[in-house]
Amino acid sequence: MRMVCISRSNDIAIGLRLAGVQSFFIKDEKEIKDKIRELSKDANVGIINVTEDVYEIAKTELNSISKTQDLPLIVKIPNSK
């Protein structure tokens, strides 16, 4: 299982890539929601890390995933300051 990250901060995306986490730097709200749906259906994804701002954009989708699926685990991480 792999861990991924969706962020609107390029700094966070780059930092997590350096740590070996596949990261997606996405600004567009529709693209964020589409990527979350895509990743939630991928059996190889075990954890989806999202920054606080991404969580606020896709709260409904993320809560639905958490309630209806055992995996992936959704983890909210702080935005960069």
What positions do the PLM features span?
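Short beta->alpha connector loops at strand-helix junctions that form conserved
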Residues: 25-31, 78
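C-terminal structural segments of small proteins and small subunits
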Residues: 50, 54-81
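N-terminal first-folded block
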Residues: 1-27
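Phosphate- and divalent-cation-binding pockets in alpha/beta enzyme and binding domains
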Residues: 15, 34-35, 57-58
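Alpha-helix capping/helix-boundary segments
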Residues: 11-12, 31, 54-55
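A short, acidic, amphipathic alpha-helical segment used as a generic capping/interface helix at domain edges
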Residues: 31-39
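Short, solvent-exposed amphipathic alpha-helical segments in soluble enzyme
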Residues: 21-22, 40-41, 63-67
